[in-house]
Curated annotation (Swiss-Prot):
Gene3D superfamilies: Butyryl-CoA Dehydrogenase, subunit A, domain 3, Flavocytochrome C3, Chain A. It is found in: Periplasm. GO terms for biological process: anaerobic electron transport chain; nitrate assimilation. It comes from Bacteroides fragilis (strain YCH46). Substrate binds at residues 231, 279. Binds 1 Ca(2+) ion per monomer. This is Cytochrome c-552.
Length: 493
């Protein structure tokens, strides 16, 4: 005989079922409401955007939430133990770096990076770009604009990629006026993520990969990899190229450059042919546990937020340490203090090796110059210069990736450790050369305890540099902006 439910049990089951249905209804309603709001955003655009629209303010008319958070990249109020979003004079903090870059523009000026809204302002004010008074002068090619503005793909489309690269930096000052923004990463009609610059697409193609087959989650990192990577200016045309053909590691790229017999510059003191790393953030991040587990750049640097029932990516791109509750704690249950200290612990260890490497490498350059002055020959110095090149490449590769000590801490410590070893080997090789010329005492070291002293030692006339830059900023830049406004390159909203 079947057991019958008691009356109260039946009512309990009924009420429970109704509660489940009610909760599910709320969830579905919320999802439908959010979907409807998303559809409403696309169906009720205030302006139609077609082609490459470089003016970020125009996108802001249709996507105010994203635009308002993007404008927050102008803020400079966050500082962590080692980084932040304010411009800090790194050469002032680490004067040895002036010596490491002797003969290269970075010895004049190098600060920590600010947010995307400052991209045009910072490159224009940097002493590294010089003071070009016309379209044909100045130390840098127009390739230096490539990652600074959505005006770049617009110009590439207008005049061709090769023609864009094969010009002086000052040639497009009145055209490249909008800072990094919407069109750099988004299709204008549907806002899908896209690749707006050729170098990444070309690098994939050379490896036999089709970047158009990337998943949406992969694209949340690949749009960043258009710029946050290692690259170089290839040939006389200064064609921007990623050295990925042999792989992502520091050794793979070194082999690529060695095979091409490439150097960014010849060091003014040691005469070593130096490789200048850019910012291999993407490559190093791919060697870390987060990327290997499928976490994208945007997951941590552009976390989701909700406003008025609308979920969207926060376009205030910044360090995840500034918003641990919306980044790290989405997956990790530890306290903010614990998670922050986990990051700092990794950074401190890498920073310790970095400091030692910079000191030894600066001494190697100075000792190499001393050896040349004592009559050393090219043959005698060959091994030492090779070791200096290898040591500095590893130092720069580790340092230029600002988040590398967190993204892939073991790899960064390995790279810096190998760099330190090679710097010490270089100093030993130089001492043997000096011994051949009858010199066995310690090489006298100059006072490079401040940025100013180091710059004077390597022969820079900083007063002249700053004076020329000041004149450029007062005369040429206003002309660029006036012309840009007249041609409608800047928004009038």
């Amino acid at each position: 005989m079947e057991k019958k439910l008691k009356s109260w049990q039946g009512w309990l089951l009924f009420c429970g079922a109704m509660a489940v249905v009610f909760v599910l209804g709320l969830v579905v309603s919320s999802l439908m409401e959010r979907r409807a709001e998303t559809v409403s955003v696309f169906n009720n655009k205030r302006v139609e955007i077609t082609g490459i629209e470089a003016r970020n303010e125009v996108f802001g008319e249709n996507y105010p939430r994203q635009y308002e958070t993007w404008k927050e990249t102008a803020k400079t109020d966050f500082k962590s133990e080692f980084n932040g979003n304010e411009a800090v004079d790194v050469l002032e903090q680490r004067p040895e770096m002036v010596v490491l870059w002797a003969g290269y523009a970075f010895s004049k000026d190098y600060s920590t990076p600010r947010g995307h809204m400052h991209a045009i302002e910072d490159i224009t004010h940097s002493l590294r770009t010089g003071a070009p008074m016309d379209d044909k002068s100045g130390p840098q090619p127009s390739t230096c604009w490539t990652c600074k503005s959505p005006d770049v793909p617009r110009m590439m489309e207008a005049i061709g990629v090769d023609s864009f690269y094969n010009n002086k930096w000052g040639a497009f000052g009145s055209e490249i006026v909008n800072p990094i923004g919407c069109a750099d990463c988004h299709e204008p009609t549907n806002m899908k993520l896209h690749i707006s610059r050729p170098a990444l697409r070309e690098a994939f193609a050379r490896q036999g990969k089709d970047i158009d087959k990337a998943t949406p989650q992969e694209m949340r990192s690949l749009v960043c990899a258009q710029c946050h990577v290692e690259y170089y200016f290839k040939g006389d045309g200064k064609y921007l190229t990623f050295p990925w053909d042999k792989g992502f590691s520091v050794e793979d790229m070194e082999a690529y450059y060695d095979e091409a017999d490439f150097a960014d510059y010849t060091h003014a003191l040691s005469k070593a042919r130096i490789l200048k790393a850019q910012h291999p953030d993407y490559e190093i991040s791919q060697m870390g546990i987060h990327a290997q587990r499928g976490v994208s750049c945007a997951d941590c640097h552009m976390p989701y937020k909700s406003e008025g029932g609308m979920k969207f990516s926060d376009h205030h791109i910044q360090s995840p340490l500034a918003m641990i509750d919306r980044t790290c704690q989405v997956c990790h249950r530890e306290s903010e203090e614990t998670l922050r200290n986990n990051v700092y612990d990794r950074q401190r260890k890498a920073n310790e090796i970095r400091g030692r490497l910079e000191q030894e490498l600066a001494k190697a350059h100075i000792e190499a110059e001393f050896a040349w002055d004592k009559g050393a020959t090219d043959v005698q110095m060959a091994e030492a210069l090779k070791l200096i090149r290898q040591a500095q490449w590893r130092w720069d590769f580790g340092v230029a990736s600002h988040g590398g000590a967190f993204h892939a801490p073991q790899e960064i410590q390995r790279i810096l450790g190998h760099g330190l070893d090679k710097a010490l080997q270089a100093r030993l090789a130089i001492s043997k050369v000096l011994a051949q010329h009858g010199y066995t005492a310690d090489v006298p070291m100059p006072d490079i305890s401040t940025k100013e002293k180091a710059q004077e030692y390597i022969g820079l006339d900083m007063e002249k540099e700053r004076k020329a830059k000041g004149k450029f900023l007062k005369t040429i830049v206003p002309e660029w902006l006036e012309k840009a406004r007249a041609n409608g390159r800047l928004a009038k909203l």
